[in-house]
A protein has these predicted regions:
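Short runs within selected transmembrane alpha-helices of multi-pass transporters and secretion channels
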Residues: 71, 139-158, 169-177, 195-208, ...
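Hydrophobic residues within alpha-helical transmembrane segments
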Residues: 21, 25, 56-59, 99-103, ...
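Transmembrane helical elements of multi-pass membrane transporters/channels
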Residues: 18-37, 139, 150, 173, ...
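Helix-terminus/linker motif at the lipid-water interface of multi-pass membrane proteins
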Residues: 32-50, 120-127, 183-190, 252-283, ...
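N-terminal transmembrane alpha-helices
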Residues: 8-45, 58-73, 77, 81, ...
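Hydrophobic transmembrane alpha-helices of multi-pass small-molecule transporters
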Residues: 62-65, 177-182, 207-211, 282-286, ...
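Small-residue-rich hydrophobic transmembrane alpha-helices
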Residues: 50-110, 147-166, 273-337, 369-391
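Short alpha-helical transmembrane segments in multi-pass integral membrane proteins
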Residues: 1-20, 78-145, 187-242, 299-365, ...
């Protein structure tokens, strides 16, 4: 069982999969309950509110992405300290990251609530979409601080050698969201406000339960205790995790660009179709992200301990697993395109046909996505936030934005659906280049 596996162990394929499985399940389940949110809005509220939620979602994810940055960057730092045998410093740094997350999250919650009408206008919400954009956005961003805490603790549960407990918390949050979605939208008919409240309350479960656990005496590697904020560790953690923030911001900005292009070329149906693709992509890519999150503390620990042979083994095994996973998920996406589109938008024949066609073109991106996500996470785990951020920035912003702008000129609307695959191909080249260039510094080859 994964609770018996220690960061200091030698990891076979079996042990690596057992250790990372809870974080994979955690990320997949997080994505699934996000998808359920979309399903309820689309089927019980309508396609215009569904488009409104999808339009404002990138801004919400940018705010929440700060939690991913602190969580992944802080976990890399804390795991390295544990590998070096500096347990007291690891506890202090962990406590500092949680306090910083809480304070920053409260500030961002206020910003989100106050600026939402201006944000909706900036995102070019139509007159029919504007009320739902503002209502949903204000409620959800009001819970940004709990969303950030949830994201931070997802990473730290793994460093604390409690991945299964992290999975339990995620499942509890997800079940809360799904039950409240059904209650607020299907029974009480609260519309997008119900979806937003359900999401916010589920994030309270995901953010507050771990806080209580780590504040109390526990059997994990980490403890929370009173601490002061120190600039250097915070900047170091933010630097390490900058690729995760960059990925979040870039994906959100590119999502806005997709929406602009689709509104121009197709209209609201294009935004709705793209929303379906994003919800399903969350689930598929969550497998790769979950593996990278689960593997990262192991890489950081052995890097801190100077175990070069284990680093080589972890990289070799991970590359093979990402390759096999890419093939499997691409095949699954092709086969499931039609039924998944029907699940979301089967009530509208034209929208269903558009979504199915788009999904089949979009699916090729999964072939290389896992490798690129792991490469970025691998450098974060090695405490090289700069390289990780470059890979992430190029992959999620530069290459995708360029493709979304250029490919429609050559392939019309199909160019939009092929854009992400084009970006993954270029990112694969960059990832391979950095892995080869840095091999002598870190001795992982």
């Amino acid at each position: 069982m994964s609770e018996s596996i220690r960061l200091s162990d030698h990891f076979s394929y079996s042990k690596l999969l057992r250790f990372t499985l809870p974080s994979i399940c955690m990320m997949v389940f997080t994505s699934i309950y996000g998808v359920v949110d979309g399903l309820f809005v689309s089927n019980f509220v309508g396609k215009t509110p569904f488009a409104a939620v999808n339009l404002v979602m990138p801004f919400v994810m940018i705010l929440g992405g700060m939690g991913f940055m602190i969580g992944t960057g802080g976990t890399a730092l804390v795991s390295k300290l544990l590998g070096e045998g500096k347990k007291d410093e690891a506890h202090s740094t962990f406590s500092m990251m949680v306090l910083f997350t809480l304070l920053l999250g409260l500030a961002l919650s206020a910003v989100g609530v106050l600026t939402m009408p201006a944000v909706a206008r900036l995102l070019r919400a139509t007159d029919t979409m504007m009320p739902d954009c503002v209502l949903y956005g204000r409620i959800v961003t009001g819970f940004t601080f709990t969303f950030m805490l949830q994201n931070v603790f997802q990473s730290f549960f793994i460093a604390a050698e409690k991945p299964r407990l992290g999975l339990f918390v995620t499942v509890a949050a997800g079940v809360t969201n799904m039950v409240l979605d059904a209650l607020f939208m299907a029974v009480f008919k609260w519309g997008v406000a119900g979806a937003a409240i359900a999401t916010g309350l589920s994030q309270c479960v995901g953010g507050v339960l771990p806080l209580i656990y780590f504040l109390r005496p526990n059997s994990s590697l980490l403890r929370l205790h009173p601490t002061a904020l120190r600039l250097r560790p915070i900047l170091q953690a933010c630097g390490n995790g900058s690729s995760e923030l960059m990925s979040n911001i870039s994906s959100s900005l590119v999502g806005m660009l997709y929406n602009f292009q689709l509104l121009r070329l197709i209209g609201e149906d294009g935004v709705s179709a793209y929303g379906v693709l994003m919800y399903v992509q969350f689930i598929f890519v969550a497998i790769f992200i979950g593996y990278s999150i689960g593997c990262a503390p192991v890489v950081s620990f052995h890097y801190g301990a100077g175990n070069q042979n284990e680093l080589k083994s972890l990289l070799r095994k991970s590359v093979l697993l990402m390759g096999l996973g890419g093939v499997a998920l691409t095949a699954a996406a092709m086969l499931l395109a039609s039924p998944l589109a029907k699940l979301f938008v089967g009530y509208d024949a034209d929208l269903y046909a558009l979504t199915t066609h788009a999904f089949r073109l979009f699916s090729w991106s999964f072939l290389l996505a896992g490798f690129n996500i792991f490469a970025s996470g691998f450098f974060t785990a090695l405490n090289n936030g700069a390289v990780s951020a470059i890979i992430s920035f190029l992959r999620t912003l530069v290459f995708q934005a360029g493709s979304v702008i250029i490919l429609p000129l050559l392939l019309d609307v199909d160019g939009i659906w092929y854009a992400i695959t084009s970006a993954e191909i270029f990112a694969f080249i960059i990832s391979c280049t950095f892995l080869l260039a840095k091999r002598n510094k870190y001795h992982y080859m």
